[in-house]
C-alpha cells in the first residue's frame, strides 16, 4: 500500500499583525511537510468580515517570506469558497446531519440564565432537534433559522494527539453546534472541516486553544465521510511576563524582528526550540532542523519567550555566517545608518569589516553601527572613553603615531611595526597608545586588534580623525 503524502496547512485569520506565537504555528507544519517530502498549504480564514483586512494578509505573507516558510499551495481564501461550503451544507442537511433551529437570541439567553441558576453548564437544549416521535414547536413566521449540527448523543469522541497524548470528550458534554447563520453563511468549525477535507490535509498542527474545537470537527469529518486528520495541539507561547503572547500584551510583529536585524535562520532556530527539542542541541541550521524534525519530540508545556536568549541565538548564527553572505544582509542596514550605496560600492571592505566585527555583534543593526564608522567622515567619540584616554599625556604619542601613519606602507604588518616603533621610541606600553588611537579613530576604546581596524579604516580617515582632537 502506498503511503499517503503528508499535507499540512497554516490557516491564520487576517485580523492584525502576526507575532512569534502565531508564526510558530506556521513553522512546525511547514517543517513537518518539508521533512516528509510533503505539501504545505497556506489558507487565509477571512470570514470575519469586520476585522479581516488585506493589509493583515500582506503582513502575514511578508513575515512568512522573510522567514522563508514557503508554501506549495495557496493562499486559499475562505471567502472565495462560500459556494462550496453551501453545497456541502446542503449535502449534510439532505443526509439528516443538520437541522434548522428557530430559537431566538432572547430565548437562548433565557435558557442560559435558567441553566446557570440551576448550576448547570449553559448549553443548547435541543428544542428544535428532530427525533423519532418528537413533536417540534410550530415554526414562527418571518424568522430565518440557524442550522445546527446533530451531535451524537452517547459515547465519547477522542483522538491521540501527537503533542498532548490521548484526549477524550463525552458527547453528552457537547451541544448541537451552529454551523450556518440565519443569512446562510457557514461558521468557522464547519468551514475548517470542508477545507481540510477538500485540501486532503493529513496533519493539523496548531495551537492548543483549538483543543475544544477538535471533538466538534471530528464529528463533522465523520458526517462528511472524510478521513480525520492527525492532530497535534501545540502549547501556548508565553511572553516574558508569563502571559499568553498577544498583541494586547505587547507582542511585536514578526517583521519588527527583521527590522531589528535578526537573521531568518536564527529566528527559525529559536522558534523551533520554543516547543520542540533534539537532545541538548541549542544551535542548528535550517537544514539540520528539517533533518531532525518530527512530531514525537514536541513539548507539552508552554514555551516562554526570552529576548536575551533570542539575541544570543542570533549572535551564534552571525558568527557562523560566511562573510560575503553577511555583508549582503547587513548592507541595507548600513545604508539605513547613513552610508550612501556609492560608498559601499567603491571598494570591497564590507565583507572584511563583517569578518572583523561579527564576533562582537548580536544583530545586523549592531554590525551596521560598526560598519558605518568606516565610511562616514566624522564620528563622535564616547565622552567617557575620550576623557579617560585622550589626555595631554597621550598627545606626544598620538603626534608620533600620526607622523608614522603618513608614510607607512599600507598593510596590517607594516602598521603593527609602526605602532611598535612609536612605543619603543617613547618607552610606552601598548594600551598607552592603542587606547587613545581607538577612541579617536573608532569612537570607542573597545575594538578588535588595532592594526586590523586601522588597515580597514584607511590612511586618510585615520589622519583626519587623529587631527580632530
From Swiss-Prot:
Span(s) of short sequence motif 'KMSKS' region: 244-248
Motif segment ('HIGH' region): 12-22
Keyword Aminoacyl-tRNA synthetase: yes
Primary role: Catalyzes the attachment of glutamate to tRNA(Glu) in a two-step reaction: glutamate is first activated by ATP to form Glu-AMP and then transferred to the acceptor end of tRNA(Glu).
Organism: Acidovorax sp. (strain JS42)
Any one GO molecular function term: ATP binding
Source superkingdom: Bacteria
Protein name: Glutamate--tRNA ligase
Alphabetical keyword list: Aminoacyl-tRNA synthetase, ATP-binding, Cytoplasm, Ligase, Nucleotide-binding, Protein biosynthesis
